[in-house]
From Swiss-Prot:
Heterodimer of an alpha and a beta chain. The keyword Transcription applies. GO terms for biological process: DNA recombination; positive regulation of metabolic process; regulation of DNA-templated transcription; regulation of translation. Pfam families: Bac_DNA_binding (PF00216). It comes from Aromatoleum aromaticum (strain DSM 19018 / LMG 30748 / EbN1). The keyword DNA-binding applies. Belongs to the bacterial histone-like protein family. This protein is one of the two subunits of integration host factor, a specific DNA-binding protein that functions in genetic recombination as well as in transcriptional and translational control. One of its GO terms (molecular function) is DNA binding. This is Integration host factor subunit alpha. One of its GO terms (cellular component) is cytosol. Coiled coil: none annotated. Keywords: DNA recombination, DNA-binding, Transcription, Transcription regulation, Translation regulation. Gene3D superfamilies: IHF-like DNA-binding proteins.
Amino acid sequence: MNVTLTKAELADLLFERVGLNKREAKDMVEGFFEEIRQALERGECVKLSGFGNFQLRDKPQRPGRNPKTGEEIPITARRVVTFHASQKLKAAVEQLSDASKQP
């Protein structure tokens, strides 16, 4: 079971459940993700209560290896975005996982 929820589908859900028109729903979804992106660009942590946290992490340079030649190649330092799920989200996912294992 590998189903993906897209931004377009989120907008459709807002249209159906909240009653926004399709344009407003699309703009709301786009605006939501744009705010998260801008906050991360400013170096801020994004905390969504009951869902999780998006944080920036600086990874130092480290040695890597070319898998074909075995030659050591440095992997440059970089900044990455990490996501840590909240305990509520972890518990909900675990509950679904446990329920699907029941006969």
